[in-house]
Amino acid sequence: MKTLLLTLVVVTIVCLDLGYTLKCNKLVPLFYKTCPAGKNLCYKIFMVATPKVPVKRGCIDVCPKSSLLVKYVCCNTDRCN
């Protein structure tokens, strides 16, 4: 009986995925990092002059506004940047 109860608890924890955190790509998309609590967006920064080449990627709490020189792209799913 104890084994069955323990099994149910483990299955519940795995299914609920307690403590889920966002994963965002680093500058090289092959590598990623797990975002700390409160950082619930992934971001990617481009220079407007070279829009195909990202300058920086990571985790952020609020998406900054783009400017004339820098464009920010933010998203909220795993490795979306």
Curated annotation (Swiss-Prot):
SUPFAM superfamilies per the UniProt record, alphabetical: Snake toxin-like
Q: Identify the GO cellular component terms for this protein.
A: extracellular region; membrane; other organism cell membrane
Tissue range of expression? Expressed by the venom gland.
Q: Which GO terms describe its biological process?
A: killing of cells of another organism
The cysteines joined by S-S bonds are C24-C42, C35-C59, C63-C74, C75-C80
Which cellular compartments is it found in? Secreted; Target cell membrane
Q: Name one GO molecular function term.
A: toxin activity
Q: What is the role of the protein in this entry?
A: Shows cytolytic activity on many different cells by forming pore in lipid membranes. In vivo, increases heart rate or kills the animal by cardiac arrest. In addition, it binds to heparin with high affinity, interacts with Kv channel-interacting protein 1 (KCNIP1) in a calcium-independent manner, and binds to integrin alpha-V/beta-3 (ITGAV/ITGB3) with moderate affinity.
Please describe the quaternary structure of this protein: Monomer in solution; Homodimer and oligomer in the presence of negatively charged lipids forming a pore with a size ranging between 20 and 30 Angstroms.
State what protein this is by name: Cytotoxin 1
* Organism classification: Eukaryota, Metazoa, Chordata, Craniata, Vertebrata
